[in-house]
Amino acid sequence: MTKKKAHKPGSATIALNKRARHEYFIEEEFEAGLALQGWEVKSLRAGKANIGDSYVILKDGEAWLFGANFTPMAVASTHVVCDPTRTRKLLLNQRELDSLYGRINREGYTVVALSLYWKNAWCKVKIGVAKGKKQHDKRSDLKEREWQLDKARIMKNAGR
């Protein structure tokens, strides 16, 4: 009998969209599957993905991921034309799609990709319903983060 591979903690994450949390208030998160081609899976296994500028469009009752860039590997396939920025279908159930439609129709809301990761053998994308931040919101978040770091540093030094 074969042994299971040892799971490396933290190795399931393929790509993060850190800018999304900086530029948007994330109100609700959903987990969606991705309809991928073979060369895309190979690229994801190699960690060659970028979702920094990606967002989700809902049309004709389906969700589509725009702007995600999966860099094709040179040895992936010679007979298939690889389009790194093609739109990819998101696999969501109808209840989740209806919830997204209801939230997006409100003024100022959008859906952005937050992270791309492996769940068992399946590639999943975490998407979030987001509302854009104003400049002063970004500044206050930065101040809060700096204060938390300073506070932790003070507490660490106070114990000495």
UniProtKB/Swiss-Prot annotation:
Protein's UniProt keywords contain RNA-binding: yes
Alphabetic keyword roster: Cytoplasm, RNA-binding
Gene null: resulting phenotype: Decreases expression of genes encoding virulence proteins. Not essential, it has a diminished capacity to survive in murine macrophages. Decreases virulence in mouse.
Gene name of the encoded protein: smpB
InterPro entries assigned: SmpB, SsrA-bd_prot, SsrA-bd_prot_CS
Function as written in the Swiss-Prot or TrEMBL entry: Required for rescue of stalled ribosomes mediated by trans-translation. Binds to transfer-messenger RNA (tmRNA), required for stable association of tmRNA with ribosomes. tmRNA and SmpB together mimic tRNA shape, replacing the anticodon stem-loop with SmpB. tmRNA is encoded by the ssrA gene; the 2 termini fold to resemble tRNA(Ala) and it encodes a 'tag peptide', a short internal open reading frame. During trans-translation Ala-aminoacylated tmRNA acts like a tRNA, entering the A-site of stalled ribosomes, displacing the stalled mRNA.
GO molecular function per UniProt: RNA binding
Family: Belongs to the SmpB family.
Biological processes, Gene Ontology terms: trans-translation
Xref: PANTHER family: SSRA-BINDING PROTEIN, TMRNA-BINDING COMPONENT OF TRANS-TRANSLATION TAGGING COMPLEX
Name of the protein described by the UniProt record: SsrA-binding protein
SUPFAM superfamilies from the UniProt entry: Small protein B (SmpB)
Localization, UniProt: Cytoplasm
Cellular component terms (Gene Ontology): cytosol
